Amino acid sequence: MWKDFKEFAMKGNVVDLAVGVIIGGAFGKIVTSLVNDVIMPILGLILGGINFTSAKLTLHGLNSEKPLTLNYGQFIQNILDFLIISFSIFLFIRLINRFKRKEEAVEEAKIPEISREEELLGEIRDLLKEKNK
């Protein structure tokens, strides 16, 4: 049973997926920091000092003691996170596909060289065909 699990865990797809999840988690933190610490303050400065992360709408109900808050600033920030992450992934996949296409084009362009031995075998074949006519 341990051997089967070890074979499963060491297959290329499982290891690649694990590496992708770890890198994705770290990349998510970088993008979140970019949005929180760079983009949102600049956007707030441009729009007159608005801090989007704390932007919210408070609704006071008739019968409730506790007001309801809609944290739309945090929602806007999460949308920016998503857009930056998805665009970055799109660019990365596009770059990978470009390299794959170049490799495929190079492989297609390569014409296999015929060795001297193959040339001689071809000549012998042609001579035998002529002789058997």
From Swiss-Prot:
The chain crosses the membrane at residues 8-28, 30-50, 73-93. It holds the Pfam family MscL. GO terms for molecular function: mechanosensitive monoatomic ion channel activity. It comes from the Bacteria. Belongs to the MscL family. NCBIfam families: mscL (TIGR00220), PRK00567.1-4 (NF001843), PRK13955.1 (NF010560). Channel that opens in response to stretch forces in the membrane lipid bilayer. May participate in the regulation of osmotic pressure changes within the cell. This is Large-conductance mechanosensitive channel. It comes from Hathewaya histolytica. The gene is mscL.
